C-alpha cells in the first residue's frame, strides 16, 4: 500500500464518489478510472516537471461561484419556509443531514462512519445494513446523499448525531446548539 498526497478539493471529490461506507480510496479510484480490480497498473515514471501554461484572464469569462459559507447555509436552512413547514422532528433531522452533506460530503462521510452507538450502527450506505443492526431501526434515506440513517431513536439521540457531525465539520458551538435545538 502506497501513500500519496492530494489537495483538499480532489480529496473531497473522491470522497463524494463513495458508494458505500467502507469503500476504500483505491476502490473508488479504480471505479472512476474504469480499471478492473485484476488489471495490472503500469508504473508511471516522472522524469521532469512540467509547468502549466499561464492563462490570461479574459473579460468574457464568468466568475467562479464563491465557496459556500457553512454557517450561513445552515442559518438559511433554519429560516427557510421548507424547513419551517416540517412538523415532524424526523423530517427536520433528515433535512439537516442532507444540508450538512451538501456542504462538505467528505467530512460528513468520515464522520458518519464513526458515529454509532454501543450496539447500533446509525449511518450506512444501504437500508439492509441498518436493518441487520436492529429490526426496529426504521431506516430512511437521507435525500441527496448515498446514506441511510436510523430514525426510530429519540430526539436527543438525533441531536447527538447531528452535533457529532457538525463538530467534525468544525461548526461553532453556538451554531451547533441552534441547529440541534430545532430538531
Curated annotation (Swiss-Prot):
GO terms for molecular function: sequence-specific DNA binding. GO terms for biological process: negative regulation of DNA-templated DNA replication initiation; regulation of DNA-templated transcription. It comes from Proteus mirabilis (strain HI4320). It is found in: Cytoplasm. Pfam families: SeqA, SeqA_N. The keyword DNA-binding applies. The keyword NADP does not apply. One of its GO terms (cellular component) is cytoplasm. This is Negative modulator of initiation of replication. The gene is seqA. SUPFAM superfamilies: Replication modulator SeqA, C-terminal DNA-binding domain, Ribbon-helix-helix. Residues 118-122 are annotated as: Interaction with DNA. Negative regulator of replication initiation, which contributes to regulation of DNA replication and ensures that replication initiation occurs exactly once per chromosome per cell cycle. Binds to pairs of hemimethylated GATC sequences in the oriC region, thus preventing assembly of replication proteins and re-initiation at newly replicated origins. Repression is relieved when the region becomes fully methylated. Keywords: Cytoplasm, DNA replication inhibitor, DNA-binding. InterPro entries: Arc_rbn_hlx_hlx, Ribbon_hlx_hlx, SeqA, SeqA_DNA-bd_C, SeqA_DNA-bd_C_sf, SeqA_N. Homodimer. Polymerizes to form helical filaments.
